[in-house]
Amino acid sequence: MKRTFAFALTIFLCLGFLFGFGSKEELPTAIDPANPSPQDEDFLFSQRIVSLVPSVTETLFAIDAQDMIVARTDFCTWPPEVAAIPSVGGFDGKTISLERILSFKPDLVCLAEVMHNHLIQPLEDLGIEVFVSNAESVQHIQDEILMLGSFTGKMDDTMLLLDTISWQLEQARIQATEKATAESPDTVYWEVAAAPYFTPGKDSFITDLLAVIGLENIFAQVPQAYPQVSEESIIAGQPQVIFFPDYNHQGQQAVQTIARRAGWQTLPAVINGKIFPVDSDLFSRPGPRIGEMALQLVDLIYGLPPQLEGAP
């Protein structure tokens, strides 16, 4: 039995920037995302999982399947308990060898399309199941979580997690709607990297996450997950909010650096002080904390403490 799954995940931090640029190639899909439960009568739940994807590792912990993880990467750092699991190396495919993966005798290997595409066929040729993570929207993240729950037999925990995520997303949407006024910002430039400039595009979960809380990525119609854009196009977009991953934990110093860029003083985001650093690890991982991300963005925009009463 063979199952290869492709959704859409692009992690944009790798040795500082784990992200893949460019268009995606289609990979075969053995299970319909709308009906992710395996139907094969000889199906067995995964018992030995090597996870090369930080968001997948987080998900496995979140659905109480962490005991099935036999190996991870150096960049699988959340939750903290993951440190006790052996590592196969860095996130970059060049630092991970097939031999190292096989040494853990996995029955399922979870990998990222952009970084690990070269591992898919060799693993399948050896009869090892492969899960290709590729989440380009909030719904795809939830679909992926559901599939991981079905592979591991942890459906009760998975459904509880999905209920929590759905509630968090709805709370974020409600809070944003209630606080929004005619003067509230609604266009966003999300900076992944500068000089050259990279930003989430049409195929990024970040673009979809912003839409959930009523914000529009000024590059939402640009193909690819993380396209390179010109500084001129950023200025022309006149974003009312700027978000950026605070890789080096510079906080307000990094905010001032952005605000002082030549020609950026005309941007509404700069004029109104709407430049916000975000957690670079959290916002690079389309996984079980997607609802938390939405609530944090609402808090940044509207200055609200997260309202969590009544959480499932």
Language-model-derived ranges and their functions:
Residues 1-45, 312:
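Short, low-complexity disordered leader/linker segments with a strong preference
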Residues 35, 88-99, 222-231:
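Short helix-initiation/N-cap motifs at beta->coil->alpha
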Residues 43-48, 118-198, 219-224, 271-312:
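Extracytoplasmic substrate-binding proteins
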Residues 47-114, 215-218:
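A short, structured surface patch at a secondary-structure boundary
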Residues 53, 113-114, 195, 222, ...:
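Short secondary-structure boundary segments
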Residues 73, 203-226, 246, 276:
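His/Asp/Glu-enriched short active-site or ligand-binding loop at hydrolase and phosphoryl-transfer sites
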Residues 93, 97-114, 128, 230-247:
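Proline-aspartate-enriched helix->loop->beta-strand connector
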Residues 115-125, 241-259:
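A ligand-binding cleft/hinge motif common to bilobed small-molecule-binding domains
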